[in-house]
Structure formats: C-alpha cells, structure tokens
Amino acid sequence: MIPVTSKSSSGFALPDLSTDRAHRAVPAEGAARAALEGRRTGIAALLPFVGPAVIASIGYMDPGNFATNIQAGAAYGYRLLWVVLAANAIAMLFQAMSAKLGIVTGRNLAELCREHFPAPIVWGMWIASEIAAMATDLAEFLGGALAFALLCHLPLFAGMIATALATCAILALEKRGFRPLEAAIAALVGVIGACYLGELMIAPQDWHAAAFHLVVPQIPDRAALTIAVGIIGATIMPHTLYLHSGLTQDRIAPRDDTERRRLMRFSNREVVVALGLAGFVNLAMVMMAASAFHASAPGMADIGDAYHTLIPVLGPAAGVLFLVALLTSGVSSSVVGTMAGQVVMQGFMRRRLSVWMRRAVTIAPAFAVVACGCDVTRAMVASQVVLSFVLPMPMIALLILSARNDVMGRYAMRMPLRIVAGTATVVIVGLNAYLVWAAFN
C-alpha cells in the first residue's frame, strides 16, 4: 500500500497520514489497487500512476535545452533535428529502465550502486553526480532568473531572488504529499507545451525540410558536433535517471508478478507520453529558432538577444510566449533538480540535507556566475557539456544493474534491449571522447 511513514526510501519527506489527510488518500489508493487488479481499464487505469515520468520529463525541458536548441536552430536550421529525436528516443529507453529498476527492486539507482559497486566507484559516482547537480541547477536557475528579469523588467539579481522564492513555494507543496507537488509540476509542463505549440503556430515553418532533417543524420562541421553533444547533454539528464527510480517507490506496491507487470506497463505508457511531450517541445525550440534566426541571425547564441530579436521578427506574442516558457521551465526544473539531489545523496551516502540547505548549495554557482559578470547563456551551454560528460556514469550503471539476474531476477533486461542500450551508451561515450580530442587538437 502507499507508504505511511514520514520518510520514503527515496529520501523525500512524506505527509503524516495519521492526520485526516489519510482519508483523502484512500480514493487514490483504491483506484490504483483496482487498476493493478484489472478492475479499471484504459485512461482510468493509468491516471493513478501518472506522476514519476511527468516529473522526470521536466529535466528534458530545462533552460539548458533552450540555450543549446537556440544555437542549433540559429546556426544550422533544421539540420540537427535528428539529434533531438535520437536523444529523446534514448531518453525514453533509459527512463523506462530506471522506472523498472525501482519497481522491481524497491530501491533507487543510487542505493543499488552503493550496494553492488566497489566503494571507490561509489564515491566517484557521488562526486560526479553532485557536480552534475550544480551544473544542472546553474542552467535551470539562471534561465528562470533571466526570464523573470526580462518579463518583469527587473535586474538579473532580482530575477534570481524571485526564482528562488518561486522554487521554494513549489517545494513547500511536498509537505502536503507527493500528489499536490506532482499536480503543480504537471501544470507547469502543460504551460511549457502550450507556449511552444503557440510558437509553432506563429513562426512560419518549412515542414518538408523539417521532416527530411528529422530522419536524415547530418553533422555539417565540428562546431555542429559540439552543439550536438550539448543537445544530448541537455536532453538526457543524469539526475533524472536517479530520480525516476526513486519516485516509483512512493506509490502502491504490487502484491504479485501479475500486478508488477501491469505496473511496469502503466509506467512505460507514462514514459512514452511524458517524454513524447518533452521531445515535441525540444523539436519546437529548434524549429522556432531555425525559422526566426537562421536566415537573419545565424550566430544567435544568447537567450536575451533571442527574446529581443523574436519581437520584431515574429511579433510581441512570440516574445511573451518564449519568456513564459523559459520562466516555467526554469522554476519547475529547479524544483526537480532539488528533488533529484536528495535522492542522490540519500542513495549514495545514506545522508540527507534539508531541502533548503541543498537549494542554497546548488544555487551558489549561479550567483557566482552573475557576480563575476560571466555571460549567462554561455555558462548555461557550458553546463550542458559538463552534463554530457557525467551522463555515461548513470547510464552504464543502469545498464549493468538492469541486466543482472541477482538484482532484477526474472525481470533482467533481455539481450536485444541490452544491445540497443549498450550501443546508445557507447555512442554517447564516443561522442564525448571525440569532443575532448577535438578540444585539444
């Protein structure tokens, strides 16, 4: 049944169900149990389990994506759309693997790494994950702050304060249980999707060219490869692989293999829908940038400049939609990043920082960037490249653990999926290695 303790294994504080809120949780638990028993079908069966993939999908629409996708569309038009599509497909596979790992084992990825890997590897993964968390929050926090500043005509520092307050307000919903927090994040996901649907309707598109470059791989030059690696780093997020496996634990527990298989099917469907929306948003970002900037400003690389250029090219509505999407993305992804950081520390170190302490630690680099006068967009793009280097660690760990019979039992990954997931991991590691070689040559 739904956990009733004050702390879940994934490290989140859950509401005290001894209060009268327990009575309000019963219908949701009953609906979930009915779905697992096969007494509910269709959308009604899926709804009680919606949440983990929706939260994880925010990581695929964070401000780092805005920065890299604007560069991709402005510099290369539609020619890197296939990278976005491929990265999204890989993300679906690995998020489904992460959710399955949590459902089958009852533990999150970080906990399993601690249990099954040597201590030096565990320490290395934890340190790399914390660096990735700071790099992630750098992009998320700066993106939200920049949007606040431009939308409300505030100094950037004031935008940072406003973003911090908005993030804390959403995190405070966790005290009421995971459902209110999930509902708030789902609403923000809907806002981002609606904004970019509006952008596509405003910006004229060459749909034939977009369809062609969606399926025909092209890397025009070395700079395009760097952006492609950044797209992968911005699209497939290390922290969401840890987080998703943890989020599956705070829900109703299957009582037998039949219910477990149903739960995994529901999880896979949610992954496809939630990350399908994230993929649409990322494709729309590149297409909007291609339409607005490729012909007139191919060197566009600054989010602030992109906003100011959008208004004369596509009209004020396009500029407002862009900022609302960026603001929503920055605030929501910052919340999710904090949640993921809790899972990582609890899993690897068996320790928990308070949410507010973790929030303070991870936003410190963002304040440092502004204080030093660094270019905000360049810092955001650099953070995505950092993420692409950290990414292979949780991917390899997830691949190894998902294939082990002593961890997954009868649910261990079968050979065809091992080959696909292994190939994707090798490609990403190879791209990162090439990027390092190119940087020094």
UniProtKB/Swiss-Prot annotation:
Keywords: Cell inner membrane, Cell membrane, Ion transport, Membrane, Symport, Transmembrane, Transmembrane helix, Transport. It holds the Pfam family Nramp. It comes from the Bacteria. It is a multi-pass membrane protein. Disulfide bonds: none annotated. It is found in: Cell inner membrane. The chain crosses the membrane at residues 41-61, 74-94, 116-136, 141-161, 183-203, 223-243, 271-291, 311-331, 360-380, 381-401, 419-439. One of its GO terms (molecular function) is symporter activity. InterPro entries: NRAMP_fam. The keyword Signal does not apply. Belongs to the NRAMP family. HAMAP family: NRAMP (MF_00221). This is Divalent metal cation transporter MntH. It comes from Burkholderia ambifaria (strain ATCC BAA-244 / DSM 16087 / CCUG 44356 / LMG 19182 / AMMD). The lineage of its organism: Bacteria, Pseudomonadati, Pseudomonadota, Betaproteobacteria, Burkholderiales.
